[in-house]
Amino acid sequence: MSAEQIAGTGVIHGRFQPLHLGHLEYLLAGAERCRTLVVGITNPDPWTTTEETTDPERGLPESNPCTFYERYLMVEGALTEAGVSHERLRIVPFPHSFPERLAHYAPADARYFVTVYDDWGDAKLDRFHALGLRTEVMWRRTDKPVSGGRVRRSIAEGQPWEHLVPPAVARVVKECGIDERIRA
């Protein structure tokens, strides 16, 4: 990628319930495209989580076992462990269920990086376009090799799961008792 194609500030977002290797691929692809990466954590609390018709399970309490702070630790740990310096990284709440609020959390003049796997990805892209945000679709795919649901199910069923997440995330899950919470 040439210097002219690198954004000054890029915004990328995810629920990270928990952050897995698919998320890490996405986050690192975003980091390659900008000098400063703003990572928005969606559904930051139960009061900024609404039902999404294109993905109804994403708002359920059992789909959101990790707090904002725990996910902050996951994002920070995974990205710095992968070589992204703290100086380039900003982590913010990102209540995309309320698009009119996003300008209060992330810069409107940044480039917003997205990936599209399904109707939910297209719905988010439409929301960003409606807000007049500059977007870049990094890829469109139909197959997700790993998902947060798969990680949560593996933990709940007592199956191996650490291979699905970066080492820093496995540490946060264990240290914060997220694995015990999911199994309860």
UniProtKB/Swiss-Prot annotation:
<dbReference type="GO" id="GO:0016779">
    <property type="term" value="F:nucleotidyltransferase activity"/>
</dbReference>
<comment type="pathway">
    <text>Secondary metabolite biosynthesis; bialaphos biosynthesis.</text>
</comment>
<dbReference type="Pfam" id="PF01467">
    <property type="entry name" value="CTP_transf_like"/>
</dbReference>
<keyword id="KW-0808">Transferase</keyword>
<dbReference type="GO" id="GO:0017000">
    <property type="term" value="P:antibiotic biosynthetic process"/>
</dbReference>
<dbReference type="InterPro" id="IPR014729">
    <property type="entry name" value="Rossmann-like_a/b/a_fold"/>
</dbReference>
<keyword id="KW-0045">Antibiotic biosynthesis</keyword>
<comment type="function">
    <text>Catalyzes the displacement of the beta- and gamma-phosphates of CTP by phosphonoformate to produce CMP-5'-phosphonoformate, an intermediate in the biosynthesis of phosphinothricin tripeptide (PTT), also known as bialaphos (BA), a natural-product antibiotic and potent herbicide.</text>
</comment>
<dbReference type="InterPro" id="IPR004821">
    <property type="entry name" value="Cyt_trans-like"/>
</dbReference>
<protein>
    <recommendedName>
        <fullName>Phosphonoformate cytidylyltransferase</fullName>
        <ecNumber>2.7.7.93</ecNumber>
    </recommendedName>
</protein>
<keyword id="KW-0548">Nucleotidyltransferase</keyword>
